[in-house]
Amino acid sequence: YYPLRAMLLSADAVRCRNINLYDRKLYKMLVAPASGVYADLYFPAHNDGWYGESLIAQVSLYEIACQRYNNDPFFLSVLQQCYRYTDRNFGEALQNNIEIPQVTSMETWPSVHFKETGYTVLRSGTKTVVMKYGPHGGGHGHPDKLSISIHDGEKEIVSDMGTCAYGVPAFTKWYRKTLSHSTLTVDAKDQKESTGKLLAFKAYKDGGEVSAEAPDVYSGVTMERKLILKKNKLTDILTARSDEQHLYDYVLILTEKPVFSQTGEVIILNDSPSYNYIKNAIVRKQSSPLSCKIGKAYMKIEVSEGQEFEVITGEAPGIPPGNGSVLSKYDSPFCYPLIVRVKDKKLRIKTEWKF
């Protein structure tokens, strides 16, 4: 919003000279970021994004936008949602001489695909699932093609943690590593800078589905991921193919500790320096589906029939200190990486969520 705020205020300033800059391009610039928020109006913290940035902080801009675009229904909806959390006491509200009807619940916004940025937002009621496949992001990019985040309407249960302060050692050694993102790590290495490809996107009233591939993140390995969200159920299928054997680590960065009925064994993770950030690691060796409870959610893990796999859990640096209003939603300063590990040429992991 840093440049967008300047553009909007400039457009408002030149109106006195009968210059109208409130065109379709500016309209789309205002709609796009607001369309990508979670149900609690916080933004996913992609790349070097600071965790806890909220649409509520921009409500004054949407007061202007609503007025200049003739009480546009979407901007009116944005204002209604923001004023669920804050009072309408901004100076811009005095200029926008309309009454904003109060609402007490989140309006159901549709699933969306941001083609240029390269990510999708699947929505079902207040449930949101995001998949990121697009351009690397230059100097602020993270090696996290096909990474996901899951928001249950109250908070993230699978998180994209964004960045910590740049001077903190964990910035480059943990938060900017593939391992700290909910995607696939191969042979304990970071993904290469690349751009993935969208294969399909469909939006429904009660969810949607998306599939994308990342053929260039690891030499000789092709990755593909498909998400299907319908009501309160999510199916996540990730596949990888290669002519050679690899160590595949399917990772989910959880905000709550997963609870299993099966016990495990202590393991020390030292596959690469980034793995050293995961403490108190436990491994469970499996050859059949495994289920766990994550807060209020339930998840089932399946791999290809007959294939042995390991489920590794532990603790690692979590959502960085920043916006206190959002951090209060999380009980712990840690995140809880869940790693499904397979050593083979091919990988197919299916997780089914109910949340």
Predicted regions and their residues:
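Catalytic Cys-His active-site segments of thiol-dependent hydrolases/isopeptidases
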Residues: 158-163
